[in-house]
Amino acid sequence: MGKVIGIDLGTTNSCVAVMEGTQPKVIENSEGARTTPSIVAFTDDGERLVGQPAKRQAVTNPERTFFAIKRLIGRTYDDPMTQKDKGLVPYKIARGDNGDAWVEADGKKYSPSQISAFTLQKMKETAESHLGQPVTQAVITVPAYFNDAQRQATKDAGKIAGLEVLRIINEPTAAALAYGLDKKKSGTIAVYDLGGGTFDVSILEIGDGVFEVKSTNGDTFLGGEDFDNRIVEYLTAEFKKEQGIDLTKDKLALQRLKEAAEKAKIELSSATQTEINLPYITADNTGPKHLALKLSRAKFESLVDDLVQRTIEPCRKALKDAGVSASEIDEVVLVGGMIRMPKIQEVVKSFFGKEPHKGVNPDEVVAIGAAVQAGVLQGDVKDVLLLDVTPLSLGIETLGGVFTRLIDRNTTIPTKKSQTFSTAEDNQNAVTIRVFQGEREMAADNKLLGQFDLVGIPPAPRGMPQIEVTFDIDANGIVNVTAKDKATNKEHQIRIQASGGLSDADIDRMVKDAEANAEADKKRRELVEVKNQGESLIHATEKSVTEYGDKVPAADKGAIETAMTALKTALEGDDVEAIKARTTDLMQASMKLGEAMYAANQAAGPDAGAEAAASEKKDDVIDADFQEVDEKDQKKRA
């Protein structure tokens, strides 16, 4: 059995780790970094870039560079959060065939699961390169407050990337696993996780290797991206005030502003003031315009104060659901890049009444926890038991549009619960089961996860038939629902697939597409390598011909020139086999040059020796440093 890896699929950055013996290890990517930007881009010639290469070209290619895609995963196009996101990103968000939010580049639509799969593929390749063996299984993390559709879409992304997702694990729970792995202490901890796009808070009890989640809460549309956007809004408003030009319509300018905002935000975690300089940000008929202004930490904090305060209400709810007070929390663990902001640390300290624990790397701790869970599943990590919860209540729509809960939020998973319902009308021969997730009293105000029909109910007065509805939530937090007519034992079961969601056919198509892309990437890399090899050979041969061309017969020299010309012609095209063949031809033709070089060096050998001897005679005195070595020391060293 191959290694199971742990992946933190983040909104802004992703990270991969693996258990090496009893210790988790974060794996560096091909660029030597321990985290990889969750960014995917397509170039003019159709090449796909992932991670840092994609981020580097974002300013010049904003419409084909997809970032913060995790905010769209598992969401419908009509979701208010999708509509909000449309105004914040330079790329096109389009309606998928299934009604979900997809993205579009050059007329081709991609599902968020597909874009996320490209990042997961990069993580998979990073692990394979480090381990020296294929990787086919993974544990992937998601925000604790993700609903069923978002969890299912994340699992689909893993499948598209060629990974069997053994477990979907909540990010704060993963962080707690990493935090508590080597610590023998027990107690109640709060994990405050503010990442690039989502916020979660979980309350856990730890003791004797058992990690029990008591409650979780959060906001799947609150994170570092929102803090960046506040700076961008401030910069565009200030520029408009000064220059009278609206930069919000200029996608290139907006992308530059976004990069500058992220940089300023990071700098203000350690500095009290930063300067933002963007020369040639735009131009009008009077000439080019430059943006230059100072941003203080105090001003930044005032711009984002409401975002910081938005994290407190979920903390309050999580404590209430767990049945504990802030004073009963033994340790507060901070996770996610945004927790480096001093204001965040201050607010957390004020709310919980204690100094938060900063002993974990906020960018890597979630991936480390995922690797620990992978180790548990693989049997490498013993005596660790993880008991997670479902973040939202689950139920069905009943008469009058009421939301009837079958499983309450913060119920430990896996879990199974049944309830018996009946018909609303006389002689009703079918019922539609509509499954919802949320906390509102009316079904329509919650998230519709899916629906199905149970048909063939024998005619009977209303209220007589007995229909048993069973909810089954697995350890990934993914829901299965069964409806059964007790009179006939007729049963209908579905794995809840969001009203949109990807069908198996969609996933298969995307898997094939990903495999084809991987093959294309491999061919592109091979082409670059053989071209480099050919060009290096031409350079070396030309140099040798200049130096030793007069030492070889004219016929051999002519053959070398012909082979060189043929290789140069082949290098202008993209035929790998042709370039390889012409490279081999030139190598064989150049062998005569090698013989000439060797003969010339042999002939120069005696002369060179004579010169060296003459030189030695001229220099009668040789200066040298010397050191006396004790005989005993010499023996010791020997």
Swiss-Prot record:
Q: Where is this region: Disordered?
A: 602-638
Phosphothreonine-modified residues are T198
Instruction: Quote the Pfam families the UniProt record gives.
Output: HSP70
The UniProt keywords, alphabetically, are:
ATP-binding, Chaperone, Nucleotide-binding, Phosphoprotein, Stress response
Nucleotide-binding: present as a keyword of the record? yes
**The organism's place on the tree of life at top rank:** Bacteria
InterPro entries linked to this entry: ATPase_NBD (IPR043129), Chaperone_DnaK (IPR012725), Heat_shock_70_CS (IPR018181), HSP70_C_sf (IPR029048), HSP70_peptide-bd_sf (IPR029047), Hsp_70_fam (IPR013126)
> Which GO-annotated molecular functions does the record name?
ATP binding; ATP-dependent protein folding chaperone; unfolded protein binding
- UniProt keyword Transmembrane, yes or no: no
Chain intervals with Acidic residues compositional bias = 622-631
Q: What induces it?
A: By stress conditions e.g. heat shock.
Q: Where is the composition biased (Low complexity)?
A: 602-613
Q: Which family does it belong to?
A: Belongs to the heat shock protein 70 family.
Q: Which HAMAP family match?
A: DnaK
Q: What does this protein do?
A: Acts as a chaperone.
What is the protein name for this chain?
Chaperone protein DnaK
What organism does the UniProt record list as the source? Methylobacterium radiotolerans (strain ATCC 27329 / DSM 1819 / JCM 2831 / NBRC 15690 / NCIMB 10815 / 0-1)
